[in-house]
């Protein structure tokens, strides 16, 4: 038992080191470390333990940074399966895992796959978390950005305007997130006039 506790502490230290590598953009090193951490967590803690789930998510994040999307899809899908089974489909953690998968589809340029996921995530977050929870405007923004990539500029502009209105109300007109939303709205507005 003492060895297992030592192993778990060592794994946490390795994960912290992998996060540092990710932060420093040494993604390949982060992936290398996290593959080992995940393998050991699966052995010591099983696939459903929260630290195993976090290790799987961290590995997927670093893989996404080096465009290894297929493995990311698999890792995030496994976390979604486990979260849905343990917590239910509308639990905030399940929705966070779904969002990570949808964002990976977006990063991979698979906008048609990302779009229905973002629609569902947004609807669930409004229902579960409410319109003003920080995750909700992020979901609306992800959907708006996806629609823009699909050339659906008018639909995207409507969502971006909703985001601006919500962020002005909740965060204030000068908050960096509000300013970013205005910038995205202007980009979409110009695309509408150019089309």
Where do the model's predicted regions map?
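Intrinsic-disorder-linked linear interaction elements in eukaryotic regulatory proteins
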Residues: 1-195
């Amino acid at each position: 038992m003492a060895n297992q506790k030592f192993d778990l502490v060592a794994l946490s230290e390795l994960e912290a080191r992998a996060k540092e590598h990710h932060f420093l953009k040494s993604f390949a090193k982060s992936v290398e470390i996290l593959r080992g951490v995940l393998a050991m967590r699966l052995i010591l803690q099983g696939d459903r333990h929260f630290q195993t789930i976090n290790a799987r998510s961290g590995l997927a994040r670093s893989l996404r940074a080096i465009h290894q999307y297929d493995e990311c899809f698999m890792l995030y899908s496994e976390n979604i399966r486990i979260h849905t089974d343990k917590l239910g489909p509308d639990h905030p953690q399940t929705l966070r895992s779904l969002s990570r998968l949808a964002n990976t589809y977006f990063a991979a340029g698979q906008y048609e796959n990302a779009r229905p996921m973002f629609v569902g995530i947004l609807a669930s977050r409004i229902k579960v978390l409410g319109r003003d929870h920080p995750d909700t405007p992020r979901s609306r923004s992800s959907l708006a950005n996806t629609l823009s990539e699909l050339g659906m500029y008018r639909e995207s502009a409507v969502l971006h305007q909703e985001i601006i209105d919500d962020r002005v109300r909740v965060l204030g007109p000068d908050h960096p997130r509000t300013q970013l939303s205005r910038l995205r709205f202007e980009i979409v507005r110009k695309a509408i006039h150019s089309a």
